[in-house]
A protein has these predicted regions:
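Amphipathic, non-transmembrane alpha-helical segments in extracytoplasmic/periplasmic proteins
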Residues: 1, 53-74, 127-144
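Short beta-strand/helix segments in adaptor/scaffold domains that form protein-protein interfaces
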Residues: 1, 57-61, 66-71, 80-85, ...
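Periplasmic POTRA and POTRA-like interaction domains that precede
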Residues: 2-53, 77-127, 149-185, 225-233
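Gram-negative/organellar outer-membrane beta-barrel architecture
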Residues: 33-36, 105, 122-272
Length: 272
């Protein structure tokens, strides 16, 4: 204000001090223990409110939530009254969509069933990275990366999962020799990601003058949503055997054939 003075006017500044901070409340992300962060804030109860310190605390709050608890959140509302009460409302970022790129062979559902989150869920970086580790452990990919987009709605984001596939099929052939079976040829073929459905198929054939073996295997990692797996193996083995007759002078030759298989069911006990 201005007041008259000798030979002019004098300017009087009226200073209104900020209130003493009595209470700080956080809301919006229920699973985060904000009391832990309050201990390291510059703004503390019992002291005069410093606006610059408060803004610095709020800037660090978002990074702390993301680093310690994985959530992406923004400051949606901030209020402070003359009684020293500060209310901070946060808005968690939710998942608007999931985009999967780079999977030329692998079907989307093979990747999606390893994700523990879905559309509309609050984004948790720890949960996202844990799910992507499960995808990598499938053995179908060499590299996996993620990216979050900025949408028109600041409370939504789109997760893009970028994959680099590896070759999962193999085929080998060759010959072996033993004094019992003589010369034996073999052919083996397998695919760890059959038709891109995450199933495993393998076939083996061994053949020679005295021996013929055929094996076929199939493995389905998910026969239900809980991760129960099913494995089926079938085989046929035919081998020429010789038996010394009672006169100990002649050998009897016969072809022994065995058909069989096995069925296995499994359930995961841990994360990986």
């Amino acid at each position: 204000s201005f007041e008259p003075a000798i030979a002019g006017v004098q300017v009087v500044f009226h200073v209104v001090e900020n209130p003493i901070v009595r209470e700080i409340n956080f809301s919006g992300v229920a699973s985060v223990p904000f009391a832990e962060y309050q201990k390291q804030m510059k703004t503390q109860t019992g002291y005069i409110l410093n606006v610059h310190d408060l803004w610095e605390d709020l800037y660090g709050l978002r990074e702390w939530i993301a680093t310690e608890y994985g959530y992406l959140a923004r400051i949606a509302d901030l209020s402070a009254d003359t009684d020293g009460r500060i209310d901070v409302e946060l808005a968690p970022t939710t998942l608007k969509d999931i985009v999967i790129e780079g999977n030329e062979k692998t079907k989307d559902f093979v990747i999606e069933r390893e994700l523990s989150f879905g559309l509309g869920d609050p984004v948790n970086l720890h949960e996202v990275d844990q799910s992507l580790r499960r995808v990598l452990m499938l053995g179908f990919f060499d590299e996996i990366s993620r990216d979050f987009s900025e949408e028109d709605d600041p409370d939504e984001t789109v997760l893009t999962i970028d994959l680099t596939e590896r070759k999962t099929g193999s085929a080998t052939f060759g010959v072996s020799y033993s004094t019992q079976d003589r010369l034996v040829g073999f052919v083996e073929a397998a695919d760890e990601n059959f038709l891109g459905r995450g199933q495993r198929v393998n076939a083996t054939a061994r053949f020679g003058k005295k021996l013929q073996e055929y094996e076929l295997g199939f493995y389905e990692p998910y026969i239900d949503k809980t991760g129960t797996s099913l494995g089926i193996n079938l085989y046929r083995r035919s081998k020429q055997v010789q038996t010394l007759l009672k006169n100990h002078e002649e050998l009897s030759k016969a072809q022994r054939t065995t058909n069989g298989g096995d069925l296995t069911l499994g359930r995961p006990f841990g994360e990986f």
